[in-house]
Amino acid sequence: MNKLQEQLIALGGVFQAAVLVDRIARTGQASEADIGCMLGSLLVRDPKDTLEVFGGDDLNLRDGYRALVGALERDPSSLQREPLRYALSMLGLERQLNKRGDLLDTIGNRLPQIQSQADHFGLVHENVIASSGALYQDTLSTLRQRIQVHGDMRFLQQASNASKIRALLLAGIRAARLWRQLGGHRWQLVFSRRKLLNELYDMMRTPS
């Protein structure tokens, strides 16, 4: 796996979280497997490669890859506008988070508690989702920039959906942090668009 592929996997994680946030906001639903993959990515320690963070299978990120391709192709028919907005907002929030050692410490201190809950209850148990959502609220929600989620108020006002959305945003920002640590930069999305697309097309064709 080359460096660009590693970056695209992490960026695919950002877009996967964005797609799931949009899906829950609009329909109130997202599969447990998809949510579990993203929550699990928060708890992975010392992965052998970037794909292992997301369960070791590109299929776990297929919706994120599609949304990323749509953004890079700039084709109005395939562009997913809200997921793109959420993804770019997560990249921006991660840059703010990187300057806040106190918030990074809080996240680092509380993730082991969430891991213990996941070990006891299971990864997609409501307690684990609620704790992950609360961690987002106590840290990233305190930053100046906020992510405004648009959707159906019937679903957005349900506490369980609000927790899922916050937990997914936390996972997306974790993926954004990983992307940046792997050498990812926002200017790549503008100036290296064709190169990223060609690599993504290959990744989506080739089984992991």
UniProtKB/Swiss-Prot annotation:
Topology term for the membrane: Peripheral membrane protein
Cellular location(s): Cytoplasm; Cell inner membrane
InterPro entries according to UniProt: HflD, HflD-like_sf
Entry's family note: Belongs to the HflD family.
Main localization of the protein described in the UniProt heading: cytoplasm
Presence of the UniProt keyword Cell inner membrane in the record: yes
Name of the protein in question: High frequency lysogenization protein HflD homolog
GO cellular component, one term: plasma membrane
Name of the coding gene: hflD
Keywords: Cell inner membrane, Cell membrane, Cytoplasm, Membrane
Highest rank taxon of the organism: Bacteria
Cell inner membrane as UniProt keyword: yes
